[in-house]
Every structure is written in structure tokens, then in C-alpha cells.
């Protein structure tokens, strides 16, 4: 995911999601990079500007850690709220990072995890509609369904971003770097 001239800890990047047809779906400004490795990127944003494909703009309400991995067809947004931590997991292509932004294709399906641990698979109808409209291949469908199972396994077993330590470690690192800015 990274190259030598890529962003470093404390740098800010833009995140762009696209749809399968190549159209821009959504843009997040100003996500602080907390960690990069050959395979993954962890970042955080708080009250960042989001621009929708139709031009609407809004500001996020709470701090959110973001996790992208080059081998998995999902990304994970950890929302840190007063009533607890919740997760919004996008089924999406592995992200690529270039000089402009971190980019991925959003494949509509989402898994939401509530602070009480309840899980919900969202936007199944949207996935089916877009799959028909844009002709998602059988391979894409198989990959995404497999990655839903991987993601649920991570959730059930507290792996990676779903571990208790993840939020504490990475949100504290974000606060520390923010104080240095």
C-alpha cells in the first residue's frame, strides 16, 4: 500500500470512495495518518469535511479511526462516541494510495456493529440493485461474500480494529500527535 514517498505519521490525507462504474461516491478531507505498513494504513479524523457525489457537504460528528488493508475487501471505521464505540465496516476493494488520495471502490454492503455488540448487515438491496446495474461479476460477488465472513469472524473474535486495545492505542496516539501540530 505504501511507497517510499508516501505519507508519514502525522500527515493528513484525503480518502475517496468510488462506485463500481468509476464515479466518485464520497470524499473525506483531513484524515491524519497514524500508522502505515506494507499492507495497512490506520488513520483518524474528527469533525472532518465529507463531500457527497451530489455536492452535499457535512462534517463528521465524532472522532473516527479508519483501517484499510491491501489484502482484504473491507475497510473499518471505528466511531468513538459518548455512548460507546461503534463500527461501520464497508465491503470495498482493497484501497490504493496515490499522491492525490487513498482510494477504494465501495461495494454497497456494510456491517454495522453497535456498542452493545449487535451486528447488522446493511444495504443488501442496494448491493443487488448496483450489482445488476453495473454487472458485478460472479468473482466479485464470491470475494465480497467471503470477506463478509472474514469480517464477522474478526468482529466475533475481537481481532484487529475490534480488539479492546486498538481504540485505546490508536485514539491516544491521535491525541498525542494532534497536540504536536
Curated annotation (Swiss-Prot):
Belongs to the Ntdp family. It is an enzyme of class 3 (hydrolase). InterPro entries: DUF402, FomD-like_sf, Ntdp-like, SA1684. PANTHER family: PTHR39159, UPF0374 PROTEIN YGAC. Its cofactor is Mg(2+). Mg(2+) 1 binds at residues 90, 106, 110. The active site is at residue 26. The lineage of its organism: Bacteria, Bacillati, Bacillota, Bacilli, Lactobacillales. Has nucleoside phosphatase activity towards nucleoside triphosphates and nucleoside diphosphates. NCBIfam families: PRK13662.1. GO terms for molecular function: magnesium ion binding; nucleoside diphosphate phosphatase activity; ribonucleoside triphosphate phosphatase activity. This is Nucleoside triphosphate/diphosphate phosphatase. Its EC number is 3.6.1.15, 3.6.1.6. Mg(2+) 2 binds at residues 108, 110, 123, 126. Keywords: Hydrolase, Magnesium, Metal-binding.
Amino acid at each position: 500500500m505504501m511507497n517510499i514517498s508516501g505519507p508519514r505519521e502525522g500527515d493528513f490525507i484525503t480518502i475517496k470512495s468510488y462506485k463500481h462504474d468509476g464515479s466518485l461516491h464520497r470524499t473525506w478531507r483531513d484524515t491524519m495518518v497514524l500508522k502505515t505498513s506494507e499492507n495497512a494504513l490506520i488513520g483518524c479524523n474528527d469533525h472532518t469535511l465529507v463531500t457527497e457525489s451530489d455536492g452535499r457537504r457535512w462534517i463528521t460528528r465524532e472522532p473516527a479511526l479508519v483501517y484499510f488493508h491491501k489484502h482484504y475487501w473491507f475497510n473499518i471505521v471505528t466511531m468513538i462516541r459518548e455512548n460507546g464505540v461503534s463500527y461501520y465496516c464497508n465491503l470495498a476493494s482493497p484501497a490504493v494510495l496515490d499522491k492525490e488520495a487513498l482510494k477504494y471502490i465501495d461495494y454497497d454492503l456494510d456491517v454495522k456493529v453497535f456498542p452493545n455488540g449487535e451486528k447488522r448487515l446493511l444495504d443488501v438491496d442496494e448491493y443487488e440493485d448496483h450489482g445488476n446495474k453495473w454487472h458485478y461479476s460472479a468473482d466479485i460477488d464470491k470475494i465480497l461474500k467471503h470477506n463478509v465472513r472474514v469480517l464477522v469472524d474478526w468482529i466475533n473474535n475481537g481481532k484487529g480494529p475490534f480488539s479492546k486495545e486498538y481504540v485505546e492505542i490508536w485514539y491516544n496516539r491521535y491525541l498525542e500527535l494532534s497536540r504536536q501540530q
